[in-house]
Amino acid sequence: MSAADPSQGNKSWTVADSAALYGLDRWGEPYFTANANGHVQVKPRGDQGSCLDLVELVEELKSRNLNLPLLIRFDDILEDRLEKLHSAFEQAISKYGYAGRYQGVFPVKCNQQRHVVEQLVESGRHWHFGLEAGSKAELLIALSLVNDPEALLICNGYKDQRYIETAILARRLGRQPVVVIEQPDEVERIIRSSQELGAAPFIGVRAKLTTRSTGHWSSSVGEKAKFGLSFPDLLSTVEALRQADLLSDLRLLHFHIGSQINDIAVLKDAIQEAGQIYVELTKLGAPMGYLDVGGGLGVDYDGSRSASAASTNYSLQNYANDVVATVRECCKPHGITLPILVSESGRAIASHFSILVFDVLGTGTVPGAVPNQTGEEPLTIHNLRETLAGVMATQKGAASEISRLQEAWNDAVKFKDDALAAFRLGYISLTERALAEQLTWACAEAIMGQLPCHETIPDDLQGLRAVLAGTYYANLSIFRSAPDTWAIEQLFPLMPIHRLKEEPTQLGHFADLTCDSDGKLDRFIGNGQTKTLLELHNLRQNEAYMIGMFLAGAYQEVMGNLHNLFGSTNAVHIRMTTGGGYQIDHVVRGNTNSEVLEAMEHNPEILLERLRLASELAIQRGELKINDVRRLMDHLETSLRQTTYLQG
């Protein structure tokens, strides 16, 4: 289905038109723009540094045998996000005269990749930036990487005795772990461990807030929240710590109201409630000192700056201002020392730095040209030809013709159904059945071509856009590289990274490589609303058509799975150099077929040996020649060494 004239795009189409169409000038700020060549360009330091042509970068990486799909991580963007976060809080602290400071942590669960976590720890060292762990494995990562005695190690999640003892003993290594009590039964384990080891960790408590949240993560708050202490539990925890002479170690209050807070009003209410809890804990005798506002600092995926699920109605500076101002308002009247502010803003830090680039393998469209009549045809075929002729005879773009076009489409659907019924009963041939289908789609295309552009169109005719849309077959696995698009209908910006000087004349959606009907991308960012089709270009012979998925640096890699045994993609870490160049800091090769087979307990050597023996038997039976066997085994051995994606 054409978005414009399918044979000829708009001659006056500009790069700016493409940027507006895909929302690049909204969600891409300040890291992604389009250049005069019609390519997406990356500004890893935002408006402060030089640019990289993304298409040229991809081609150079491909020449290094780093084939698509390819995950490109810009470490400069990661650093810039960290700087912007701290700068926003520094400005807010200065603006409101807050007698305290901000000290953030990165939740390791957001992106556990070694190079990512190492980069954040090193870049955040002068802010004493720390890490948050939610499991024993993540705690091990945090303890091994953070050697700054002033940086926080927030210990969240379920905790057994060994987890707690590890955190306590880590204080003697010069680390500063804070064991956050999230379940009532953890109090006794902390007390017992402290008594046995003769030492205690810094202790925190997570409160279940009653503030109503919104969006997918609204269940993170309230009485039925998975983690946190109710108000009675908070009081009993304080009393238990007092009895064990550990109340002096209660230093932190933590809450979490969701991974993506869309509405700033929700945040204000939550901080106000948490601020009062903090005040009351100090009145009960806890020294406190830290208020951890958790995650939730959102990402404006669709660029609409709204409270929709894919956006936020606030800026980073708005967020910092409200955190600082609200906590100050809660504590000041009570003469309480203002706490050090902590956030776990993983999504806001990591989302922007990663771009997934994949190629399109081909397209599936509705049947094309209709064969001319060569002889007598069944009545259903005759009726469809007459319907098509009638549509072609209508006045193009005339509002008065809408009802006639709607009637024609209803007729076409009826005649197609008649043809299907006739085929089932054996009255028409497969060739005639196929012709009926071709004629139906020809009617649909003709009707869409005749519709006026600026009139209200009936719903059934509007639906022809989806009926005629093409399927673009993507060289990736949604379940591996973008699982949230399937699991929670997360929206990520998607667009071609080249050909932006050309008007996209097709509408389509993407289907991935998996043998699963859910393996598709069919929800896209529109102008303030979600759309089911994306404007795309016709494919060209012997020319790659490359698509970029943006803002997907948080959660996607670790949550991806091996559906159909499609593994991780190739990944590179890019850093800008002086003079506008770049260097590749790290190359992380994607899973090979051999590796994913081994992950499922298959031994590649045994598999090859079985096939070799089967080939030898086939030679003996005269079913295969030696040259054929050599080619077969060569293909198999090469495939085991290659990544799991298609390579032409």
From Swiss-Prot:
InterPro entries on file: Ala_racemase/Decarboxylase_C (IPR009006), Arg_decarb_HB (IPR040634), Arg_decarbox_C (IPR041128), Arg_decrbxlase (IPR002985), De-COase2_CS (IPR022657), De-COase2_N (IPR022644), De-COase2_pyr-phos_BS (IPR022653), Orn/DAP/Arg_de-COase (IPR000183)
Keyword Calcium included in the entry's annotation: no
Family matches, as Pfam families: Arg_decarb_HB, Arg_decarbox_C, Orn_Arg_deC_N
Stated role: Catalyzes the biosynthesis of agmatine from arginine.
Entry annotated with the keyword DNA repair: no
Record-listed E.C. numbers: 4.1.1.19
Enzyme class at the top of the EC tree: lyase
UniProt keyword terms in alphabetical order: Decarboxylase, Lyase, Magnesium, Metal-binding, Polyamine biosynthesis, Pyridoxal phosphate, Spermidine biosynthesis
Family designation: Belongs to the Orn/Lys/Arg decarboxylase class-II family. SpeA subfamily.
Residues where N6-(pyridoxal phosphate)lysine is found: K109
Name of the protein: Biosynthetic arginine decarboxylase
Binding site for substrate: L291, D292, V293, G294, G295, G296, L297, G298, V299, D300, Y301
HAMAP family: SpeA (MF_01417)
Domain of life: Bacteria
Reaction(s) the record says it catalyses: L-arginine + H(+) = agmatine + CO2
Single GO MF annotation: arginine decarboxylase activity
GO biological process: arginine catabolic process; spermidine biosynthetic process
Cofactor: Mg(2+); pyridoxal 5'-phosphate
Pathway annotation from the record: Amine and polyamine biosynthesis; agmatine biosynthesis; agmatine from L-arginine: step 1/1
